Amino acid sequence: MAGSALAVRARFGVWGMKVLQTRGFVSDSSDSMDTGAGSIREAGGAFGKREKAEEDRYFREKTKEQLAALRKHHEDEIDHHSKEIERLQKQIERHKKKIQQLKNNH
């Protein structure tokens, strides 16, 4: 009984305290973000347009990088599978030769 009580207290006491501590320090930031204060993009104008253009350029560049990485991955896969096909074809030929040798010997 004493052992299980210690285990329960250790499990819930320590973890419960950490949960309470982390919950106590967290602020609800959704209230402060609703005002949009300081957001250049929401203000509109030249700065908002410039920021949108920079974001668009960034995402186009990231998409281009991802497509290049995907293209390289597929090329590597094709190369790997081509080599695997060649290896398997050589095995098939080797087995066919063994079968032919067995037929010739008997």
UniProtKB/Swiss-Prot annotation:
It is found in: Mitochondrion. Residues 26-58 are annotated as: Disordered. GO terms for molecular function: angiostatin binding; ATPase binding; ATPase inhibitor activity; calmodulin binding; identical protein binding; mitochondrial proton-transporting ATP synthase complex binding. The modification Phosphoserine is found at S39. The modification N6-succinyllysine is found at K103. One of its GO terms (biological process) is erythrocyte differentiation. GO terms for cellular component: cell surface; mitochondrion; protein-containing complex. Residues 60-106 form a coiled coil. Residues 74-106 are annotated as: Antiparallel alpha-helical coiled coil region. InterPro entries: ATPase_inhibitor_mt. It comes from the Eukaryota. Keywords: Coiled coil, Mitochondrion, Phosphoprotein, Transit peptide. Residues 26-52 are annotated as: N-terminal inhibitory region. Residues 48-58 have a biased composition (Basic and acidic residues). Residues 1-25 form a transit peptide. Belongs to the ATPase inhibitor family. Forms an alpha-helical dimer with monomers associated via an antiparallel alpha-helical coiled coil composed of residues 74-106, leaving each N-terminal inhibitory region (residues 26-52) accessible for interaction with an F1 catalytic domain. The inhibitory N-terminal region (residues 26-52) binds the alpha(ADP-bound)-beta(ADP-bound) (ATP5F1A-ATP5F1B) interface of F1-ATPase, and also contact the central gamma subunit (ATP5F1C). Endogenous F(1)F(o)-ATPase inhibitor limiting ATP depletion when the mitochondrial membrane potential falls below a threshold and the F(1)F(o)-ATP synthase starts hydrolyzing ATP to pump protons out of the mitochondrial matrix. Required to avoid the consumption of cellular ATP when the F(1)F(o)-ATP synthase enzyme acts as an ATP hydrolase. Indirectly acts as a regulator of heme synthesis in erythroid tissues: regulates heme synthesis by modulating the mitochondrial pH and redox potential, allowing FECH to efficiently catalyze the incorporation of iron into protoporphyrin IX to produce heme. Homodimer; represents the active form and is present at a pH value below 6.5. Homotetramer; represents the inactive form and is present at a pH value above 7.0. PANTHER family: ATP SYNTHASE F1 SUBUNIT EPSILON (PTHR48417:SF1). This is ATPase inhibitor, mitochondrial. It comes from Mus musculus (Mouse). The lineage of its organism: Eukaryota, Metazoa, Chordata, Craniata, Vertebrata.
